Amino acid sequence: MAKVSAVEKNKRREIMVKRYAARRARLKAIVMDQKISLEERFKASVQLAELPRNSAKVRVRNRCEVSGRPRAYYRKLKMSRIALRELGSVGHIPGIIKSSW
């Protein structure tokens, strides 16, 4: 099990990303647009830098929904390899069975 504080911090970051997503996308579009004057682009760049760091999508870590583990994460299932193995072996995940050949 991961530390509860780490999991909660990641949840707060996810909320912050959703809250600032539209504003961040608008400012990034202005910064990247070559047709806009350099002064306006610089102003947008400064505004982008003033946004909270945790509002950047890069700061969010994929974590297992079951255990909170940050590594060995399967995106489709939203869980770690360990949780996948445990839940799959007892039959709690539809379509997942232990292989034998």
Curated annotation (Swiss-Prot):
NCBIfam families: PRK08881.1 (NF006477)
Single GO biological process annotation from the record: translation
Family as reported in the entry's similarity comment: Belongs to the universal ribosomal protein uS14 family.
Protein name in UniProt: Small ribosomal subunit protein uS14
Keyword field contains ATP-binding: no
Gene: rpsN
One Pfam family recorded for the sequence: Ribosomal_S14
Keyword Hydrolase: no
InterPro entries, A to Z: Ribosomal_uS14, Ribosomal_uS14_bac/plastid, Ribosomal_uS14_CS
Keywords assigned: Ribonucleoprotein, Ribosomal protein, RNA-binding, rRNA-binding
GO cellular component: a single term: cytoplasm
Job description of the protein: Binds 16S rRNA, required for the assembly of 30S particles and may also be responsible for determining the conformation of the 16S rRNA at the A site.
Self-association and partners: Part of the 30S ribosomal subunit. Contacts proteins S3 and S10.
Source organism, top-level taxon: Bacteria
MF-aspect GO terms: rRNA binding; structural constituent of ribosome
